[in-house]
Amino acid sequence: MSISKYIETKLIHGGIDGDKVTGAVNVPIYQTSTYKQAGLGENTGWEYSRTGNPTRAALEALIADLEGGVAGFAFGSGMAATSTVLSLFKLGDRIIISSNVYGGTFRVLDKVFKNLGVTYSIEDTTDLATLDTKVTPDVKAFFIESPANPLLTVTDLAGVAAIAKKHGILTIVDNTFMTPYLQRPLELGADIVVHSATKYLGGHSDVVAGLAVTNNKEIAEKLAFNQNAVGAVLGPFDSFLLIRGIKTLGVRLDRHTENAERIARYLEQHEAVKHVYYPGLPNAQGYEINKKQAKNGGAMISFELYEGYDIKKFFKALQLISLAESLGGVESLVCHPATMTHASIPKEIREKVGITDGLIRLSVGIEKVDDIILDLNAGINAAKEA
């Protein structure tokens, strides 16, 4: 049972809180690969750190508590978490994915799981009526991001979960962009939640990790087996870093999102900006749905400049904001999805779903917002062609 109903408190005290033996307020780092056994069949509950480690177990209990699941699982990366979840499916199964998802998710489905007989199809998950008609006997799951990467498309998670339950299939939600502080998909009917914990949960661009949570005991047993069998687990030190990062998630996201809301309004009013993608703007696609299922619009913004602006010059001129892969750290980061995060998606598919060569994705940090805006403004001014 959780110590509190409030997530702000759960972030700090949820899961396994400290060390009961020594009284240490932080979970110790059990930097060990194996555990001494008193005799044959006589262990302390720990045998080998791929199978289980006390530091990792504390993290797994914490994310289960935060998402409202029965079990959590920690992996060496977000893609390790996603791949282990996808390993639940078998030859002949098909998974419906959102029309814009992280390029790594597309790549592992297209280049790895397709070769193993697990196929996928891309659908507009915002159109529930049409989505319902796309479920054929071979479809076994929906895999959704909301807001989606990189266009921040919002999907009605409860609506999709209802369709999934009607057809007896699973709903898997990548909750990386929102985290359980802003959105809890299991409460909306999802069966499995995955995270690239590298992002907001870690929050400091110093750890690569992935998490999965389920509220279904049968799925939890299968995931536990596959986690151990596949072996892409998170080490104890990285587990400790993630626990530490999660403690400040609430205060960080409060600043992230406060900054993002102001920057989105600034970009929306800028004469050089053609389009702003941000779920927190009243005219955004899915604004009302996002308001219903999430605390706010999050801290990711994508935008496009009008013709006559050279985005290469924009990126080059930035001083405070770093051009880099990833997102969700305390520092502001910007990227070019077409050639970076979504480069593995064929150009014709990218263009069809709206990921243009002119799209810019901004991960809003927690710096003074005025400084971020000044840097964006300098970049836009430098990008204007004579």
Residue spans for each PLM region:
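N-terminal "arm"/small-domain region of PLP-dependent enzymes with the aminotransferase-like
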Residues: 1-53, 59-62
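Conserved N-terminal alpha-helix of the aminotransferase class I/II PLP-enzyme fold
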Residues: 34-83, 87-88, 104-111
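Conserved PLP-enzyme active-site core in the AAT-like
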Residues: 2-3, 13, 73-272, 277
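Short, well-ordered beta-strand elements within core beta-sheets of diverse protein domains
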Residues: 242-251, 298-306, 361-365
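PLP-dependent enzyme catalytic core of the Aspartate aminotransferase-like
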Residues: 119-121, 252, 309, 316, ...
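A common structural junction motif
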Residues: 230-231, 318-328, 379-386
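Glycine-rich phosphate/pyrophosphate-binding loop
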Residues: 29, 38-58, 65, 333-358
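Conserved small-domain helix->loop->beta segment predominantly found in fold-type I
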Residues: 261-319, 323-325, 345-351
